[in-house]
């Protein structure tokens, strides 16, 4: 543990954290008025919480802020194109591009219909297969089983399972981004967990990237926390999902997403349960889904929701360390 703490206090690590944070803090006041001027505002669904309707027109695509911040940070640090940290950056960019296209089309059409489902699925499949192949040839097909102190070799099933894993993780983070600051706050904690594990297991570059992205998200939170001046949009949420999935894949810890990313999992399950129940019985289990909207309908404020979900994520990450 002492060596891990030393790594966290390493000048490169501290520089990555501070640069990511500083770049986001600087870019926020540049992007917010620019997106306002371009009329790149969020269209709010009328079937969502009524309290959210007043947020219509809030600048979206704010994911570009931490997207650019972490990219510049990694380039300044000077990693080679084939380094592990850069592979995570490529995944951030790849899935961020899908989100960017989705956001742009929503803005152009002035509704919440961006990329068609099949278009998004094709792009997700292309990038997921590429990253699954990278994992198959460079990382190995074994993954760590939580609490078991052992590994499971997926063999020929590795690539198809990893493709499903990417689709699930990116969409789960996307669903979590439904109230001001929620996805950002939860993901900062998850990234910190993976950074510590990265340093502890010798994946230094993955640790540095995780810290840089956590710093960039903290800077972004200055503008994304309630009341949000900007939303990350699909540009940000899909990028974060792709990056987290790749970080866990390199560390051979995809199964740990279920634990430390428990909030992502619950958000996704709430939607699946709600849709299944309504289609089969005509009744809803929750007042609204994803589940953060259910709690909003129960009277919880956005600040309370973010605080409680963040504390839960912190506890889940502690459990994640126990599961190693």
UniProtKB/Swiss-Prot annotation:
EC number: 2.7.8.13
Keyword RNA-binding: no
InterPro entries named in the record: Glycosyl_transferase_4, PNAcMuramoyl-5peptid_Trfase, PNAcMuramoyl-5peptid_Trfase_CS
UniProt membrane topology term: Multi-pass membrane protein
HAMAP family for this protein: MraY
Cytoplasm listed as a keyword: no
Family: Belongs to the glycosyltransferase 4 family. MraY subfamily.
Swiss-Prot/TrEMBL cofactor(s): Mg(2+)
Pfam families given in the database record: Glycos_transf_4, MraY_sig1
Disulfide bonds: none
Reactions catalysed according to its record: UDP-N-acetyl-alpha-D-muramoyl-L-alanyl-gamma-D-glutamyl-meso-2,6-diaminopimeloyl-D-alanyl-D-alanine + di-trans,octa-cis-undecaprenyl phosphate = di-trans,octa-cis-undecaprenyl diphospho-N-acetyl-alpha-D-muramoyl-L-alanyl-D-glutamyl-meso-2,6-diaminopimeloyl-D-alanyl-D-alanine + UMP
One of the protein's GO biological processes: cell division
Keywords of this entry: Cell cycle, Cell division, Cell membrane, Cell shape, Cell wall biogenesis/degradation, Magnesium, Membrane, Metal-binding, Peptidoglycan synthesis, Transferase, Transmembrane, Transmembrane helix
Main function: Catalyzes the initial step of the lipid cycle reactions in the biosynthesis of the cell wall peptidoglycan: transfers peptidoglycan precursor phospho-MurNAc-pentapeptide from UDP-MurNAc-pentapeptide onto the lipid carrier undecaprenyl phosphate, yielding undecaprenyl-pyrophosphoryl-MurNAc-pentapeptide, known as lipid I.
PANTHER family noted in UniProt: PHOSPHO-N-ACETYLMURAMOYL-PENTAPEPTIDE-TRANSFERASE, PHOSPHO-N-ACETYLMURAMOYL-PENTAPEPTIDE-TRANSFERASE HOMOLOG
Transmembrane segments: 13-33, 59-79, 85-105, 121-141, 143-163, 179-199, 201-221, 243-263, 303-323
Protein name: Phospho-N-acetylmuramoyl-pentapeptide-transferase
Pathway: Cell wall biogenesis; peptidoglycan biosynthesis
EC class (word): transferase
GO molecular function list: metal ion binding; phospho-N-acetylmuramoyl-pentapeptide-transferase activity; UDP-N-acetylmuramoyl-L-alanyl-D-glutamyl-meso-2,6-diaminopimelyl-D-alanyl-D-alanine:undecaprenyl-phosphate transferase activity
Subcellular location: Cell membrane
Main location: membrane
GO cellular component, one term: plasma membrane
């Amino acid at each position: 543990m002492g060596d891990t703490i030393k790594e966290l206090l390493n000048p490169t690590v501290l520089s990555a954290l501070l640069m990511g944070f500083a770049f986001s803090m600087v870019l926020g006041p540049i992007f917010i008025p620019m997106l306002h001027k371009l009329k790149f505002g969020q269209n709010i669904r009328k079937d969502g919480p009524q309290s959210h309707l007043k947020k219509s027109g809030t600048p979206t695509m704010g994911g570009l802020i931490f997207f650019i911040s972490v990219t510049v940070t990694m380039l300044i640090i000077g990693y080679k194109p084939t380094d592990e940290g850069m592979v995570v950056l490529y995944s951030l960019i790849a899935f961020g591009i899908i989100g960017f296209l989705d956001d742009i089309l929503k803005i152009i059409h002035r509704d919440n219909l961006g990329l068609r489902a099949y278009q998004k699925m094709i792009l997700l499949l292309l990038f997921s297969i590429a990253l699954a192949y990278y994992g198959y040839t460079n990382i190995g097909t074994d993954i760590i089983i939580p609490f078991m102190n052992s590994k499971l070799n997926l063999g020929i099933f590795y690539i198809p399972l990893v493709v499903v894993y990417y689709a699930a993780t990116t969409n789960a983070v996307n669903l979590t981004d439904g109230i001001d600051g929620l996805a950002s706050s939860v993901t900062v904690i998850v990234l910190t967990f993976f950074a510590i594990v990265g340093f502890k297991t010798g994946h230094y570059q993955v640790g540095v990237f995780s810290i840089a992205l956590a710093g960039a998200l903290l800077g972004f939170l200055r503008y994304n926390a309630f009341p949000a001046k900007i939303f990350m949009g699909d540009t940000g949420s899909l990028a974060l999902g792709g990056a987290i999935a790749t970080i866990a894949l390199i560390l051979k810890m995809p199964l740990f997403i279920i634990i430390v990313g428990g909030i992502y999992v619950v958000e996704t399950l709430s939607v699946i349960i709600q849709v299944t129940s309504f289609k089969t019985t005509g009744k809803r289990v929750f007042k609204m889904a994803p589940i953060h909207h259910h709690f909003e309908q129960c009277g919880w404020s956005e600040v309370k929701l973010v605080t409680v979900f963040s504390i839960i994520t912190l506890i889940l990450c502690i459990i994640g360390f126990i599961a190693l």
